[in-house]
Amino acid sequence: MLPHRPRAYAQLAYHIFNIADAFLEHEVRSLRLDEGAYDRVPPPEMNTKAKIIAYGQDVLRRFRLWWDGPGHAPNLSRKALVYYGNVTVHEFLERTTWHCGQHVRQLVMVLDIMGIEPDRPPSEETFAGLPMPDKVWDDEGS
């Protein structure tokens, strides 16, 4: 289990990919982001590292298709259909980006605790301009 969270490592990896997938559901399938969307867990058949990695690669592939197509020049000022308030698609995309980034920071910290050197870890510049939380975990000491 993860420190500070009742979540397994695989669930964290899935969650990172699913955050971006929820954005794509909004943009590609016109689905509203409902409360609980970020609480999804991997389906039972997604029970190996390889399957979670394949899901992440599929999300990345679909995001690139969106970005290079309709996402290349979308109307980012239009209202996003999300549970957490009156925001634009630009704000939703920004939140999606830093939300994924925050969990990547958590995963990197877990790897560090386990003595595993991550491949291409994010740097401060990776998140420049984003409203990233100061702490990696909400309940971290100062």
Label for each model-derived stretch:
Residues 1-42, 78-142:
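Short, contiguous alpha-helical
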Residues 1-5, 51, 71:
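Proteins with a high burden of low-complexity, intrinsically disordered sequence enriched in S/T/G/P/A and R
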Residues 8, 47-48, 71, 88:
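Helix N-cap and loop-to-helix transition residues
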Residues 44-59:
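A short, structured beta-strand-centered segment in the mid-to-C-terminal lobe
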Residues 53, 57, 64, 94-97:
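Short amphipathic alpha-helical segments with heptad-repeat character
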Residues 63, 71-74, 98:
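C-terminal regulatory/effector modules of DNA-binding transcriptional regulators
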